[in-house]
Design a protein with these regions (language model features):
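Acidic, metal-dependent phosphodiester-chemistry machinery of nucleic-acid enzymes
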Residues: 1-186, 190-202, 212, 275-425
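Short helix/loop capping segments that flank catalytic or ligand/cofactor-binding pockets
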Residues: 164, 232, 240-242, 307-308
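Extended, hydrophobic alpha-helical segments in both membrane/secreted and soluble proteins
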Residues: 192, 217-221, 232
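Active-site metal-binding core of divalent-cation-utilizing nuclease and nuclease-like domains
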Residues: 205-219, 223-226
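Residues that form or immediately flank small-molecule/cofactor binding pockets and catalytic motifs
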Residues: 208, 236, 301
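Flexible loop/turn segments at secondary-structure boundaries
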Residues: 211-217, 238-241, 304-307
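Active-site beta-strand-loop-beta-strand hairpin of nuclease catalytic cores
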Residues: 223-231, 235-241
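Catalytic cores of nucleic-acid endonucleases
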Residues: 236-297
């Protein structure tokens, strides 16, 4: 199948070398298509349970979404029932419908049970999915529980259950609240900061002041050590179904609204920090560089797919600083708006890349993207299982970030590099 769609073989060295500037999106679409064919978002159920509970508790502090026959606490009850019934091995589970409904009704009541089943159970998932371009209308990523034959339900394997449940939950809320994605994004920032503080990791959120004392943006998460200043930007937006279906323009728009925008926000602060040696913060303190290394890290709430690595990321960003998207003859209004969003983000990225280069010596062999990391929150939560200080967390994030192993999987690479480090010690 990979050969049929020309996304294989992937040489482990392929992404060391930047693609031609005019073919940057084409190269990225091959990665997206490979992911669509062969990867499914996955996460440790423990991470996902904490994320679902904490994130939506933050979202609903101000108000609640009503009208669907169940409350958020009921959805958490369904999640816990599914998790209790799912096989401990990484395989799917079949369970009698009566058994699941009984457990759920005991937890949330009969009325909420019926409403939840109507909302979350898929009867014929992907019935119209034949080729990757059909992903635009597919529900692959929402398949947590499916109606099966023989009076049974199918429950997704534990590694995939969390992301599927989360995607379905967000999709259901989006039908009732058009601003839910913005609310989730704000809650994600607050939740991640609170999570690290609970673990004892020294960190803070910072509001940066410009030269005239006005707000110049914020840093969602700031970690400092004696050797490193790490600036984090947290983003909710991931890749949309249109991108998964092979729409190159939508890919550019998705990246512009998520990753590229995050890099632009962090780059602005990094440039000011390197130029002035410090950032003035709204709380009256100053963030001083003092010769330390600067790291930029964009953390995504969404899973962008499994098969990207640091080389793909850096080559992508470097191709973007030499790219402008041109309108085709048959763009509709929505596509034209997406094109404008993408080009604005690219223009900002290009100007900041030039400004950054002016701060460096003539012989410098680094650019704006050499210190850039990009991970989803599932991987960060994985690291937080063992890392409880800013120093150890940053060490884990940075180890091997300049290496290309060919795995294109942060979890695999982290395990391999950890094993190698332990052997040496």
């Amino acid at each position: 199948m990979a050969a049929l769609y020309e996304v294989e073989p992937f040489s482990i060295y392929e992404t060391i070398f930047p693609p031609y500037p005019t073919r940057g999106l084409e190269a990225l679409m091959r990665v997206v298509l490979y992911d669509e064919l062969f990867t499914v978002p996955q996460c440790n159920p423990g991470h996902m349970e904490r994320l679902i509970e904490d994130l939506f508790a933050e979202v609903f502090k101000a108000d609640r979404i009503r009208g669907q026959g169940w409350a958020h606490e009921d959805a958490i009850g369904l999640w816990q029932v599914l998790l209790s019934l799912a096989s401990p091995s990484p395989t799917a589970t079949f369970v009698k419908r009566s058994q699941l409904r009984l457990r759920l009704a005991q937890r949330v009541g009969p009325a909420a049970c019926e409403a939840l089943m109507d909302a979350f159970v898929l009867s014929r998932p992907n019935r119209n999915y034949r080729v990757p371009s059909d992903a635009i209308g597919a529900d692959t990523r929402e398949c947590a529980i499916v109606l099966a034959s023989g009076d049974r339900y199918w429950i997704a394997p534990r590694p995939f259950l969390g992301p599927a449940f989360f995607a379905r939950l967000v999709g259901l809320y989006a039908k009732l609240d058009k601003d839910i994605n913005t609310k989730i994004g704000v809650a994600f920032e607050a939740q991640m900061l609170a999570r690290m503080k609970r673990l004892g990791i020294e960190c803070r959120r910072a509001e940066v002041l410009g030269s005239k004392g006005k707000t110049a943006g914020d840093i969602d998460l700031l970690l400092e050590t004696d050797k490193v200043v790490a600036l984090f930007e947290l983003k909710k937006k991931g890749l949309t179904r249109k991108t998964n279906a092979g729409d190159g323009l939508q890919l550019a728009a998705d990246l512009a609204r998520g990753l590229v925008r995050g890099v632009n926000q962090l780059a602005r602060h990094e440039i000011a920090l390197r130029r002035d040696g410090e950032l003035r913060l709204s709380d009256g303190t100053r963030l001083r560089l003092d010769g330390r290394r600067v790291v930029k890290c964009v953390i995504s709430l969404a899973d962008y797919g499994g098969f990207h690595d640091g080389a793909v990321l850096r080559n992508m960003m470097r191709s973007f600083v030499r790219m402008r998207l041109e309108a085709g003859p048959a763009l509709n209004c929505e596509q034209k708006a997406d094109l404008e969003v993408a080009n604005r983000a690219l223009t900002t990225l290009q100007s900041q890349s030039v400004e950054f280069a002016k701060l460096l010596p003539d012989a410098a062999e680094v650019d704006l993207f050499d210190n850039l990391l990009f991970h989803n929150v599932f991987f960060v939560e994985h690291l937080l299982l063992t890392e409880k200080t800013a120093e150890s967390l940053l060490q884990k994030l940075l180890i091997g970030n300049r290496m290309v192993t060919g795995s294109r999987d942060a979890f695999v690479e982290s395990a391999l590099l950890d094993a190698g480090r332990q052997e040496r010690s």
